[in-house]
């Protein structure tokens, strides 16, 4: 059974590995369905992550800052003017509106034309909004000029990358595998390498077309020019906001000024009285200075990132991402395709890497590329070999795999002449549990059942007596009865109910087992292990399994069989059954006659040797032997008082033959037998 379970686990593992390898290597119909669904849900990304970061830094962040300034101006008054106390409400509103429009600091003793202006504080939010719109112009030009051509190029590239992998997996790799298998097991590594190199030289027309396409893209630079122009334009346009914001941050520090309202209206008409001056304050100046500083730092940082990216892209970058993996699928990328780094291959490689979720075979291609020490064909060949091995009809032998299944019928202690242990090749089948006629024996917790019975009768504990001479005398009789029953069973019987299979008997008694054995208290004395006599035969069931009083009288001493004679069939009303395997041997419940009969025959060695075997009325043993003292005490309780002998001679005397039937209850399954003296 252990070997069968191991075999089942090995086959399940092999099947699972085969399915995984099949999904890994061969393209299936699920790829086409997934590709069609992905084409509907996913769109090509025509902007790189770096370009999105630049757009956010130069456009979106300034717009957010402008929104913050406008929110503050609308939430509270943009200017505070402290008018004289004799101004009415309308006069105060007029003074505040006039000063917010004028925004000129009326310095005393200075000509009015030379008064400094604070108009930049009012214009700054609108300037930031204009700068954000200007910085979005390069991204908008890239969207209009390069999106159409870039979309067509990417669609062709992504589809061809998938096709290249599929052609290699379906065509070239199986072809190499067949050629290697045709050489036989004696093929060398050099021959394998030659087969792989010859297969690499054989290319399909589609592969040649794709290589020509890559070569042409390596010599053109249209997309490279557009990409470079986009970022250079960003650098040039960013100079304007940086210059303006730097000037504003350096010069516009004043947030309080004096506003000249003109002559007082209360003065005489036509007279030039003193002008009225009002002190004013701009509360948003500090916030605008902070926003200007943040915008300056952000634009400078974006320009630095753009410069580093352009230098890396067109000067120092050597990797082409996805195109570097094409040599694993038979597409040879040549460096002479690129006359310089300033070509479309670099731009297309970045966008293919960004749209790699459209490549259905990308994970398989990455798996092959990670095996840098092996060529693609060697990797696929090994995977296909493992797939074929998992689909084989027999279990891999010792040479095919490191797992072997040794024949369980072979004794490992006996050395065999062969060098290798025998290996059993079993066909691959679905394992099913087949019930047999000889089920495994279940453990029988006898001691636990005895403890439960003893715990249920704690109200009247019985003292434990020592082993008496009567126990010693009964033991040979029990052995003789067991031997007689065994002899009778071996001699054969009728072909009726006695031919019931033992398995059914075991199931039956296991099903009807009960622990309700009142009113006895069972002892936990274990049987001797030196001599194991055969099990006593058991009757069928308790329903009608006891003899009536007339049948008991009809048996008598004359019907008792001798020591060696088999028991007649009429003395056993029911066919016998073997005892349960979990019970101790000879563990029947025997009932003896009470010591009230006046028998004076003394014990002697001669009488002991000629003792007749007992007439057997047995049941399947469910508990160990009842102590004989317990049976005497039970009889004394039924008669109303103890019947102790007057002297030791009465204790050792043998009572006349009398058959007493115990276990008048219905539920428990016990063994009842008679003892004759």
From Swiss-Prot:
GO terms for molecular function: gap junction channel activity; protein-containing complex binding; structural molecule activity. Residues 75-125, 252-295 are extracellular. The keyword Flavoprotein does not apply. Keywords: Cell membrane, Endoplasmic reticulum, Glycoprotein, Golgi apparatus, Ion channel, Ion transport, Membrane, Phosphoprotein, Transmembrane, Transmembrane helix, Transport. The keyword Oxidoreductase does not apply. The chain crosses the membrane at residues 54-74, 126-146, 231-251, 296-316. It comes from the Eukaryota. Pfam families: Innexin. Glycans are attached at residue 86. The record marks 416 as: Cleavage. Homoheptameric. This is Pannexin-2. The lineage of its organism: Eukaryota, Metazoa, Chordata, Craniata, Vertebrata. The gene is Panx2.
